[in-house]
Amino acid sequence: AKLGKNIEVISRARIEINAMRLAVLQAAKAMDVLGNKEARVYVSAVKAMVPEKVCEIIDAAIQMHGATGISQWTPLATMYTDMRHLRFADGPDEVHHMVVGRAELQKYDVW
């Protein structure tokens, strides 16, 4: 972690993790306040963003570790595989992006 690029990668990961946490909290609050149906845009945004970003963060960690990152000496390869499978659990990312995109266009009376 003493290498400058690795410090930047760690910083970006921390920033993205914080952003994901806030997005999850926003979706949870929307579910509590608005109800599940009205909160679907927030939930879809989280379902699209979180698994994708977590895969990117794990991939960056694998890159930092080099060949060791894909070996059984670290949990990274298993973590990546598990997270990649999770991206399919709630449906394709494209479906969630469609929900968010349509809602955004409806705000401006374009859809």
Feature map (PLM): residue ranges:
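Alpha-helical interface subdomain recognition
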Residues: A1-W111
